[in-house]
Amino acid sequence: MSIRLFLVRHGLSTFNKQGLIQGRIDESYLTDEGYKQAKLTGNILNEIKFDKIYSSPLKRAAETAKEIEKSFEENFDIHYDKNLLEVDLYQWSGLTSEQIKSKYKDAYLIWKN
């Protein structure tokens, strides 16, 4: 028995649009464009037979999963799993790349390389 796994990134979020690093903070949510992206993704994926949908519990991921789920004829219970959380970027969360480069130059260079 083989398993097929599809990974989908969340749609455009408010932090993405503002150029802010998100990490695990849950202050960002989908923009109108992000909802459109999720709907389009669902329309593409709805011809594939899925057994389950898993999502990070973060708003931006959960909103994406819910929008994708609407595209299927079958109703799914979305399984929210903390193991799917974004990498925690601690003090970088909520900052722009430029702010990080300025404030945490050495750490940024290590992370980037």
Predicted regions located by residue number:
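An N-terminal RHG(E/S)-centered segment typical of histidine phosphatases
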Residues: M1-F50, K66, S71-E74
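Short, basic/glycine-rich phosphate-binding loops at helix/coil junctions
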Residues: Q18-I21, D106-N113
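Phosphate-coordination/substrate-recognition cap region in phosphate-metabolizing enzymes
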Residues: L40-L109
